[in-house]
Amino acid sequence: MTVNLKNFLNPKVKMSKMGEFQELQPIEGLEISAVSADLYGDGRDDLALFYFREGANFAGVYTTSKVTSASINWNLKIRRNFVKALMVNTQNANTFTGIKGAQGLKEIAQALSKSLTLKSSQSPKGVSEVVKITDLLFASTGVIGEDFPHLKIKNRIPELVKKLKTEQNK
């Protein structure tokens, strides 16, 4: 594998800093997508979705800090160890955002639940399954204390779900 140092050091380059990467084999039952919600302001991907068609067992290890993000608080309320999807956003940690951050995350969860349920209903197998908001996990990383851009994220959910695929390479 080669790394193009000119691209690696140039923040304006939108292509991968790693250059060519080995082909990743599909993981059975997992679909992945990534899109830009323009959280960085430069068009690069900043949202990722991992969708487990049959569901997946999970365990979480979270911070012991008393300061937690809305995403961590959401995940801690999931009382079972089974999920259907994990959505990750960058650029905003959704921490110190108060009730607005929590409400924004709930709106995202409702929109994601609806889109994944619709995707499930269009399955070639003809099996329709409701994806509940309690089937969803969230992770946010980035700046602390800024308003959570939930509308930018929510508006990209249909495209994020549409782009789900088993091949992880773009």
Enumerate the predicted regions with their spans.
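Alpha/propeptide regions of enzymes that mature by internal proteolysis
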Residues: 2-119, 130-170
